[in-house]
Amino acid sequence: MDHAIYTAMGAASQTLNQQAVTASNLANASTPGFRAQLNALRAVPVEGLSLPTRTLVTASTPGADMTPGKMDYTSRPLDVALQQDGWLAVQTADGSEGYTRNGSIQVDPTGQLTIQGHPVIGEAGPIAVPEGAEITIAADGTISALNPGDPANTVAPVGRLKLVKATGSEVQRGDDGIFRLSAETQATRGPVLQADPTLRVMSGVLEGSNVNAVAAMSDMIASARRFEMQMKVISSV
């Protein structure tokens, strides 16, 4: 079998992976705080005893685009936006701590604050609020609750968001969309980040996704054309 088939097959496989990444980005074009996933391709010459006439393809520049998204004013008390390099701490499915830029906080049926189903972590663990209470979030992340029918001067703090600071190179996205510390960062900063008291949030504001839907659609079309070309190479060899 001609080695060109393997070359084209490898390129087609990587193109499919690139299409999957682009499709995921498009699907999250309206997800608050979403960071577009990067996936580029690069040539890898085949080295060996044969002539240097074969070049394979592999993925490069994995990671996420940390460019901030635009701010949308929602006036919803439980929506918060953070400064650049600021993150909200959440509890992942395995109980470990993860980080997100998605500030769309929800209240589940048990009164626990969640983001995309993940419990929001405060400085003393997951945060719960009284049922039916009016919730406000201060700039420093302090969450206060006013029970129905109570006078305004009885507002009481129920917790404080754990706000942490990390650069894009210090975190890695998981399959669940939540970011976690890289191994290198854990070696220098510990298994979890400490709360940063200097960080501030804007209540009633959401950071939008940084996905450029038009550019992503163009990338999807270009990937489809590359895949079609690679299939023609395979069928003609």
What are these regions (language model features)?
Residues 1-237:
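Amphipathic alpha-helical polymerization modules
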